[in-house]
């Protein structure tokens, strides 16, 4: 995609903005263009948002770089903290997603926690590869906190919200999923069957541990028994 939009929910506003600790929604869109005119043309729909008059900050079609973008992510993902994540691929419309995601955006449990609603469209046939699960929209939430005494509450917050998304979810991206807490498909059925066949050939005794299992018992309902 030439234009990659992501709607971020966070309690860390852009520099210079005071939101009083409340969550803010950031429509952060990056793109790769040949010239400024092309950038303005392809990003023009974003400049017609009906909520622009309520924006705390507006930046449109300005140059950026990795050096500009990376510190933003560093601030949102501080070292030395505890993290829990969950995610969903979906083809659901914004009309269907908004009531569910709105609750996630409004109730972020810590200053550092955040949620992303990523425009992945359009999906396309994938080559012969392990990555085989995707949708036109990618949603992920990350709880970030300091103390182990809060582990259960932080993990339950993110898991419970993504259970609410299951009716419209196609599956999960493995890198942001914790299958020991919530079962989810992460490969296309044919690809997963092929994986199991390869394991039967090369690891028939299952010496390699399934990380999505608890104490030797399958925790992921999508794994064949």
What positions do the PLM features span?
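Soluble FAD-dependent oxygen oxidases
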Residues: 1-225
